[in-house]
Amino acid sequence: MNDQYVQKTSKDGYRSRSAYKLVEMDNKFKLFQEGQKIIDLGASPGGWSQVASQKGANVVALDIKPMNAINGVEFIQCDIINEFEILREKFKDQKFDVILSDMAPESCGLKSLDHIRIMLLCEAALNFAKHFLSHGGTFVVKIFQGESDKDFCNELKKMFKTVKYFKPKSSRSESTEMYLVSLGFIGSKPSI
């Protein structure tokens, strides 16, 4: 494949090209500081967890799919929707400085349906953040542009001081993929 980011992944030691998306977001928004506690939702194969841990963060990676170990990263294979109560018990009253979500559904090829499916994952990630994100924390979530992303963005604006759309250069130009970077968590009532 003639993709500069795919070629760079092996040279730079990243597990996926998506690592460069997070590097770009960190360069622009200064997401990470050493010693932060971070949750990486939809972590497998681990590119985002690698980036966050290299910045000196304490990372807990969650994914329904398996993931090979990364030094300094705790991995929990789980379904954040169907196993939420187990996770709530595990993390109890813990709070995290940053919650990242690069979750995406398996594409069916129908953009409108893929959009609906990713927005359901976005809502699940946001519910997770409502429970576990610390006051002033950061939430980054992948979306596909479509009918309801603006409503979701407006929902975030009620809970965060700053919310920005971001399309990384390392994202494929033909993709409807974007990220919402939400800074300064003010708080909200969890839905569960």
Swiss-Prot record:
Enzyme class, first EC level, given as a word: transferase
Record's subcellular location: Cytoplasm
Keywords: Cytoplasm, Methyltransferase, rRNA processing, S-adenosyl-L-methionine, Transferase
Reaction catalyzed: uridine(2552) in 23S rRNA + S-adenosyl-L-methionine = 2'-O-methyluridine(2552) in 23S rRNA + S-adenosyl-L-homocysteine + H(+)
GO MF annotation list: rRNA (uridine-2'-O-)-methyltransferase activity
UniProt xrefs under InterPro entries: RNA_methyltr_RlmE, RNA_MeTrfase_FtsJ_dom, rRNA-MeTfrase_E, SAM-dependent_MTases_sf
Binding residue positions for S-adenosyl-L-methionine: G46, W48, D63, D79, D102
Cysteines engaged in disulfide bonds, as pairs: none
GO cellular component, as recorded: cytoplasm
Main subcellular location: cytoplasm
Spans through the membrane: none
Catalytic activity, EC: 2.1.1.166
Signal sequence interval, chain numbering: none
Active-site residue numbers: K142 (proton acceptor)
Similarity comment: Belongs to the class I-like SAM-binding methyltransferase superfamily. RNA methyltransferase RlmE family.
Function: Specifically methylates the uridine in position 2552 of 23S rRNA at the 2'-O position of the ribose in the fully assembled 50S ribosomal subunit.
Name of protein: Ribosomal RNA large subunit methyltransferase E
Name of encoding gene: rlmE
